[in-house]
Structure formats: structure tokens, C-alpha cells
């Protein structure tokens, strides 16, 4: 039996992709770290606000509006979370 040990980054990535899929009603198989919320996943501004709020609750962090506007991709979210958790 083989066990895969997930790094913190892997766990964050997996959870963020699940959250994005749920909030944007997308199949998580189409979401990558390079996926852009508006251009690739067809999110609107309300979708992105709701997603940022869910991320804040899940990870116990604050994402000010001026920072949220800079978050364009799944990778941006993961990086933001990692920076706030370290």
C-alpha cells in the first residue's frame, strides 16, 4: 500500500480548487492553478467577492478589497493564503 504525504501547499491547492469549483459551479477537473476567475472560469464580480469571503472564513484570514482586486487566478489565492499562514 502506498501512502502519499501531501504538503501544506498541496492541501491548500486541493481545498482552494474544491472551493472554486463549488462557488462557481464548475467541474473541478477543469480548474488548474493557472485558471483565471473571470476570463477562464467565467466568474462575475459577485462570484469573486463570494469566493474571497469563503476563503477568508475557511482560512481565518482577511483579504482587504484592494488586495482582492489583485487576485486573478487560483494560484494567486494559494500564494496569498500561504503568505498569511507563515
Curated annotation (Swiss-Prot):
Pfam families: PP-binding. One of its GO terms (molecular function) is acyl carrier activity. Residues 10-85 form the Carrier domain. Its main location: cytoplasm. GO terms for cellular component: cytosol; membrane. The modification O-(pantetheine 4'-phosphoryl)serine is found at residue 45. One of its GO terms (biological process) is lipid A biosynthetic process. Gene3D superfamilies: ACP-like. NCBIfam families: acyl_carrier, PRK00982.1-2, PRK00982.1-4. This is Acyl carrier protein. The gene is acpP.
Amino acid at each position: 500500500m502506498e501512502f502519499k504525504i501531501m504538503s501544506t501547499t498541496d492541501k491548500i491547492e486541493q481545498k482552494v480548487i474544491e472551493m472554486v469549483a463549488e462557488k462557481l459551479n464548475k467541474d473541478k477537473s477543469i480548474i488548474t492553478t493557472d485558471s483565471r476567475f473571470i476570463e477562464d472560469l467565467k466568474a462575475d464580480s459577485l462570484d469573486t467577492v463570494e469566493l474571497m469571503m469563503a476563503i477568508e472564513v475557511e482560512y481565518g484570514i482577511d483579504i482587504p478589497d484592494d488586495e482582492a482586486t489583485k487576485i486573478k487566478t487560483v494560484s494567486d489565492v494559494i500564494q496569498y493564503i500561504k503568505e498569511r499562514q507563515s
